[in-house]
Amino acid sequence: MVASPDPGHLEEVRGTIATYLSALKVNDMARLRDLFDVKANVAHYHVKKDTVATNTLDEFIGVIQSLHAKFDNAEEIGEAMNVRLVKHLASVELDFCFVMGPNQLRGTDLFNLARQNGKWVIIHKSYWL
């Protein structure tokens, strides 16, 4: 029998994702970077090209900064979130709407997080638009 997840950890993981969304919205790259493990990677599945592009954290942050430079707003709005905890690991599925100026794109984030030194950090993020 699998033990029930710690409800406190569930809220911490949800809080980490909420902070991610907030930092992305206000272009706070220091706070965004702090949410990720230094060796984290970000994978973007290109539906039209049927390929996966993997970016370093620095490359991902560069993409976010370029969107903020190009548009008055660049915001990922979380919609439905599903969290699964397995001891010190978490998996999060987040449906979102990404707003860039007048444009809106819908997609899904898949996050993997690990509990390190008393906090949850993102170790991998995959997404498609």
Residue positions per predicted region:
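Short, low-complexity N-terminal intrinsically disordered segments enriched in polar/charged residues
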Residues: 1-38, 54, 58
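Short, hydrophobic secondary-structure boundary micro-motifs
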Residues: 33, 43-45, 123
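Short beta-strand edge/turn micro-motifs at domain boundaries
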Residues: 91, 106-129
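Surface-exposed, charged secondary-structure patches
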Residues: 41-46, 51-103
